[in-house]
Amino acid sequence: MSRLKKNPWNRALRIDKFTIAALEATLHAYEAGTALQTVPTLAMLTEPLTSVRARARRVLRRLAPDVRERLGARVVDDHGMVGGGALPTVELPTAALTVGTSSDTTMRLDEALRGGDPPVLGRIAHDRLLLDCRTVLAAQVGLLAEALTRAAARP
């Protein structure tokens, strides 16, 4: 790391001390064999599908029955694209929370969720909005349920 800090490319690329600290922590995690637990992207990529499904069901259970019905919410098996680095086209099995009862309601829900705080991004397929629960951290389950409840309340 000290050689990297002194390298002329460091100045040319404007690598700041926070970036170097993050890189150093990541490399230490790999060296210690803890990267799968401590690097969020790796943890998401290697999480068992059963855990992802369970988290999707937890989000669904956090929705009030009337909200669930209004959204047409349910859990479905899906696939996600890793989409970068050495695996740009690799598909990964996942579980998604799917909402929307028609093309119009799906578009309104998508817009409401994207414009929310925090923004929630999904993808639309077959007139339904799919929210990949592999990318939802356990601590975000309540936030996602709240965002869906707010989106369902919008006209």
Residue ranges and their predicted role:
Residues 150-155:
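Catalytic-site microenvironment of enzymes
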Residues 1-64:
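Active-site C-terminal subdomain of aminotransferase-like
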Residues 144-149:
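Basic, glycine-rich
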